Amino acid sequence: MEIVYVEIVDVRAREVLDSRGNPTVEAEVVLEDGTVGRAIVPSGASTGKFEALEIRDKDKKRYHGKGVLKAVENVNETIAPALIGMNAFDQPLVDKTLIELDGTENKSKLGANAILAVSMAVARAAANYLGLPMYKYLGGVNAKVLPVPLMNVINGGQHADNNLDLQEFMIVPAGFDSFKEALRAGAEIFHTLKKILHDSGHVTAVGDEGGFAPNLSSNEEAIKILIEAIEEAGYKPSEQVFIALDCAASSFYDEEKGVYFVDGEEKSSEVLMGYYEELIAKYPIISIEDPFAEEDWDAFVEFTKRVGNKVQIVGDDLYVTNVKRLSKGIELKATNSILIKLNQIGTVTETLDAVELAQKNNMTAIISHRSGESEDTFIADLAVATNAGFIKTGSLSRSERIAKYNQLLRIEEELGKVAEFRGLSSFYSIKR
């Protein structure tokens, strides 16, 4: 049988804007019959130090130094000639070519933003050529699991100008039979939360990911308000809706002193662990991301040993979607879950490799957005393609977040009877 070979005939990029009004890269890949695939890369605010590197122009006269004309030029002048004539259906070879063309460990020569835009656009062009939805092209015939959404409705840390140390306080509507029902619950809780905050005199403007950023007395108060919103919206905490935290602990870690600053106090890893354990005992917390700094492996290992049988411990900055770092985490039993961000590693193939490695080792994978997003819905399809069971794509406001939720609604409808929303069963790495 002949392998389908459809030539890439053109690759081009342009500078477009992300949801923060900052420049980012959009790539277009054209195939021999005129089929086009287009993709826009996201950009993070709190970045792990081991992430693949996006290239910015640093010309202060344009976009305050955040332009991406160099990355665009790298696509048009270096990447395009190398990919033209290649088979659009050979994604691993396309991505290998991109990696070798760059030649650096962290994609700093051509830029992860240039490389990823092209990698995603090739996948989309191939799917479009076949007339297949993206999730089916990437995931094959068995792609059918709709993800449980982790919805970031209260922001702190580097995502907000308030006094909360933890970066994200999320609601997790896992106790439902379909994605559609879970999304509805999330939206209703979001609007109830808005009313509660408004009635208490808090500003209800939303941050980069669509969540609220109130000044509250403590991290614990944020959790209490979430519970209140869940109940007032008519749902049951710990049965239908749970709480997830993204601590982004590297952002409140003092490397010189080796301590964490939380709620105005210095805490050692051990004391911080106790602080989290108290919260877990009091509230229906089902998932905690980056509870410690990205180099504090020992704390991750100890914490997972203590609470990993009842809470999903997620590595984000710890792993940066990197198979090498993930392998270390698996060996050490550092976490029982990984956050997956395409632009942390920089190609579609490497992202799929990270998900596969996690799942093989009984770890869950959470497909995630970045704080600087766009109308591109690639990650919604990726979540279903990998049967990941989880997605983190922001709050219930701002079109660049809602775009992903709406795409998942379409996918659930398209899959019909074979669609699976596994709810609490998605947390297979903990004993729930």
Swiss-Prot record:
Catalytic activity field: (2R)-2-phosphoglycerate = phosphoenolpyruvate + H2O
UniProt GO molecular function: magnesium ion binding; phosphopyruvate hydratase activity
Cofactor annotation comment: Binds a second Mg(2+) ion via substrate during catalysis.
Location of the protein in the cell: Cytoplasm; Secreted; Cell surface
Pathway annotation: Carbohydrate degradation; glycolysis; pyruvate from D-glyceraldehyde 3-phosphate: step 4/5
Domain of life per record: Bacteria
A GO CC term attached to the entry: phosphopyruvate hydratase complex
Biological process (GO), any one: glycolytic process
Record-listed (2R)-2-phosphoglycerate binding positions: 167, 341, 370-371, 392
One Pfam family matching this protein: Enolase_N
Positions bound to Mg(2+): 246, 289, 316
Annotated EC: 4.2.1.11
Cofactor(s) needed: Mg(2+)
EC supergroup of this enzyme: lyase
NCBIfam families: eno (TIGR01060)
Similarity annotation: Belongs to the enolase family.
HAMAP family in the cross-refs: Enolase
Role according to the record: Catalyzes the reversible conversion of 2-phosphoglycerate (2-PG) into phosphoenolpyruvate (PEP). It is essential for the degradation of carbohydrates via glycolysis.
Protein name in the entry: Enolase
